[in-house]
């Protein structure tokens, strides 16, 4: 399935006229883990294996791709088999993550970021320019978020209707290719709440930069985990909200 389709719309300015417009395609995706635990997502219909891999890592359901036994995809249903271990405990953290301050329990289970990476401000600006240039579907539809993982000269980028899924996809793609996340940074479009930052920290990425704002929970999570968080990356400026020593 394409990432977008063309529909009829009426444009109203000085007059009203029928015009063709492109809209982004979205689907409901289900992830079933070990035949039991199930989560539903709205996502763009591509790179579902990368999404599943990044989701499993970012939610702490596995510690590495070696813990993933298999991923099978059929009719927008993803069946993932993983090494079970302490799955019941991990499942409780995932299912409760968005309610009653559940992110605070999750952040206590995440170790501090272990990375000596240093990044020049100009590299952040260049990565953002490249990310925006790569966001073809966003330019056509205005309906996607975009995320990029930068590792030295390597640059991988995904668009998705969900900002969380876009980040899952770049993490999953990097993990499948054996990327050293401790030597990587993520740039993306979207707010930075705690659940997003915990996902990045679990992968081992030390820096995240967005053109949008952090939330207070995101600020607290970044401070606690040692993550360097940049917001409002626009033109030739940005704000550093935590652990500024990584930006030179």
From Swiss-Prot:
Required for formate dehydrogenase (FDH) activity. Acts as a sulfur carrier protein that transfers sulfur from IscS to the molybdenum cofactor prior to its insertion into FDH. It comes from Methanothermobacter thermautotrophicus (strain ATCC 29096 / DSM 1053 / JCM 10044 / NBRC 100330 / Delta H). GO terms for molecular function: sulfur carrier activity; sulfurtransferase activity. Belongs to the FdhD family. One of its GO terms (cellular component) is cytoplasm. The lineage of its organism: Archaea, Methanobacteriati, Methanobacteriota, Methanomada group, Methanobacteria. GO terms for biological process: Mo-molybdopterin cofactor biosynthetic process. Pfam families: FdhD-NarQ (PF02634). It comes from the Archaea. The active site is at 99 (cysteine persulfide intermediate). This is Sulfur carrier protein FdhD. Mo-bis(molybdopterin guanine dinucleotide) binds at residues 232-237. Its main location: cytoplasm. SUPFAM superfamilies: Cytidine deaminase-like. It is found in: Cytoplasm. Keywords: Cytoplasm, Molybdenum cofactor biosynthesis. The gene is fdhD.
């Amino acid at each position: 399935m394409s990432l977008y389709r063309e529909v009829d719309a009426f444009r109203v300015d000085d007059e009203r006229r029928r015009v063709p417009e492109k809209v982004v395609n979205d689907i409901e995706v289900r992830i079933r883990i070990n035949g039991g635990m199930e989560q539903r997502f709205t996502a763009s219909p591509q790179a579902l294996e990368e999404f599943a891999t990044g989701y499993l890592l970012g939610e702490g359901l596995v510690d590495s791709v070696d813990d993933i036994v298999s991923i099978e995809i059929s009719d927008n249903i993803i069946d993932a088999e993983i090494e079970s271990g302490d799955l019941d405990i991990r499942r409780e953290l995932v299912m409760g993550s968005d309610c009653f301050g559940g992110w605070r329990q999750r952040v206590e289970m995440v170790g501090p970021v272990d990375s000596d990476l240093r990044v020049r401000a100009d590299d952040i600006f260049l990565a953002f320019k490249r990310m925006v240039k790569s966001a073809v579907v966003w330019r056509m539809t205005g309906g996607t978020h975009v995320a990029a993982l930068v590792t030295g000269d390597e640059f991988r980028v995904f668009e998705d209707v969900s900002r969380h899924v876009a980040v899952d996809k770049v993490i999953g793609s990097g993990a499948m290719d054996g990327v050293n996340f401790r030597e990587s940074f993520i740039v993306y479009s979207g707010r930075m709440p705690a659940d997003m930052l915990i996902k990045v920290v679990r992968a081992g990425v030390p820096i995240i930069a967005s053109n949008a704002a952090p939330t207070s929970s995101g600020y607290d999570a970044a401070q606690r985990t040692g993550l360097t968080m940049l917001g409002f990356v626009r033109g030739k400026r940005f704000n550093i909200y935590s652990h500024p020593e990584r930006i030179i």
